[in-house]
């Protein structure tokens, strides 16, 4: 009986030599999710099959026209049916969180402009972001499975086709936005932020950071561009806190207009509320966090205004839906960051007012109320954002738990225990930040009531690749 030898998924091509390790250097170089379960094929050249001969003239034609670089890219095109399935999933689950185009508009693009490079790669990137957010995969009729990571890598390897320094800016911007969502879900913070900067750079080059650029556009075009602008604004402000880079987008651009819809899956209410949550603090707030310093425009009164205005969410939002979860944790996160800035400005004298000292406990209690009422499956859709935001609240609380008087300290410790249980139950991408939290608890002589070890995200990068 012949013993079957196995090889890397990437290296099973006959002419590629594999060093026998799993994954090999080529798998790592191309960020390929290797299973090492492919039958090893004989090395050496392989005669061209009859079915392959017909692709040679097509490949030459595409190369001569500079619209395609290799015949392989023709053969790797994602089937329409797979993209359409992703578009339906996006419509049903994710449009309320990051609204770009409705299913009808996306399906029309798929039918009419599938062969347009800019449109095609946007639809592939949207499919990748959708599968990444929902942590799922789809299988084509040929039995090949598509995951968000695979589609994102395919997009990045074909980047010259949709970003050739010309063409349709809006599709390039949306493509980069979708790709940054894919990389944020795989905990690749550096590349996710890099893609965010690519999209913002295109926004600025196209003049979309100036309101007058929208005046000559139709209402539909304005709506789409305003949605994209504010999606990037929210993303940039989130990353500014952890990448420590000041923001470039501000609220001089008007948000999109409300739309009358009968389908709740197309409602923009959650998106409008998220815009409110991230714009109430103002640009100076996030820049102060990025530079770890406070400016004259970021005063104690303006920070206290954040606590008050973000205390509750809009009544228009359906409680404990996909949209509500992200809004809820973002409110608690920003209020905790504002509390830390006030504490940084005033030092220990801040605790002379008992009400000030109790604000952080109230923030943590509000977060616990939402935690107890939220189904667990809703957290995963938002990827690393929920663990990071909840960990920020827990970090702030442990910093000051020993500064309370005896009665308040006991309450704060009990709340910290409940918050830490939730934090430890999530998948985390930032190991360093989590270890600092554990060290702080030990230094404060607090024993965390955790019975199981820290659960890291399976896709987490090495510590050197993670923004601390």
Swiss-Prot record:
InterPro entries: Carb_Metab_Trans_Reg, Maltose_ferment_reg_DNA-bd, Transcription_factor_dom_fun, Zn2-C6_fun-type_DNA-bd_sf, Zn2Cys6_DnaBD. A motif (Nuclear localization signal) lies at residues 41-49. Gene3D superfamilies: Zn(2)-C6 fungal-type DNA-binding domain. One of its GO terms (molecular function) is zinc ion binding. Residues 8-34 bind DNA. Keywords: Activator, DNA-binding, Maltose metabolism, Metal-binding, Nucleus, Transcription, Transcription regulation, Zinc. One of its GO terms (biological process) is DNA-templated transcription. CDD domains: fungal_TF_MHR (cd12148), GAL4 (cd00067). GO terms for cellular component: nucleus. Pfam families: Fungal_trans (PF04082), Zn_clus (PF00172). Transmembrane segments: none annotated. It is found in: Nucleus. Belongs to the MAL13 family. PANTHER family: GLUCOSE TRANSPORT TRANSCRIPTION REGULATOR RGT1-RELATED-RELATED, MALTOSE FERMENTATION REGULATORY PROTEIN MAL13-RELATED. Regulates the coordinate transcription of structural MAL3S (maltase) and MAL3T (maltose permease) genes. This is Maltose fermentation regulatory protein MAL33. It comes from Saccharomyces cerevisiae (strain ATCC 204508 / S288c).
